[in-house]
């Protein structure tokens, strides 16, 4: 239900990264979606983008969408904080402006580091472990059959499962 405008290859400088980060570096692209005329800006449009993201992610096991939002662009990867600006050419441009930037410099302690597990996530960044994640994930899975949403009318099935069990504890929460 939304018009896809096209892809943009994100310009990067992999030579600033360590060997292991380059070895498992994903292909980094940005996709652009036109807001439908009948959808309001802000949260209504972001809900539609959420559905589109979940459908796209489920199309392939090796697809990870860093962000799909009308409000934010997320840059992340397996590198140190000081390498962020030197890795992404966009962040070196004077044309780029931001009201806020979140940076997290700690790698996961209970899972192997990977590009998709790097912080920040789509909506959050935190320093620690979510100790109740297994119980919460199991409860969400049990409730999926009876879930309803006035905001995702007739499209809730497209975003299920609500929690992907393949990510870190933070990724599970960030996916909802």
PLM regions: where:
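Conserved short alpha-helical segments that host acidic/polar catalytic motifs at enzyme active sites
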Residues: 1-176
């Amino acid at each position: 239900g939304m018009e896809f405008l096209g892809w943009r290859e994100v310009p990067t400088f992999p030579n600033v990264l360590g060997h292991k980060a380059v070895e498992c570096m994903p292909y980094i692209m940005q996709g652009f979606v036109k807001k439908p005329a009948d959808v309001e800006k802000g949260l209504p449009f972001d809900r539609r983008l959420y559905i589109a993201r979940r459908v796209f992610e489920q199309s392939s096991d090796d697809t990870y969408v860093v962000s799909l939002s009308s409000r934010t662009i997320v840059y992340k990867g397996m590198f140190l904080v000081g390498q962020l600006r030197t890795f992404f050419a966009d962040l070196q441009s004077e044309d780029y402006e931001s009201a806020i930037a979140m940076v997290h410099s700690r790698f996961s302690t209970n899972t192997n580091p990977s590009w998709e597990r790097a912080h920040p996530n789509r909506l959050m960044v935190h320093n620690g472990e979510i100790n109740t994640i297994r119980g919460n994930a199991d409860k969400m899975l049990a409730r999926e059959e009876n879930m309803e949403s006035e905001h995702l009318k007739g499209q809730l099935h497209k975003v299920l499962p609500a929690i992907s069990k393949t990510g870190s504890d933070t990724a599970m929460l960030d996916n909802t």
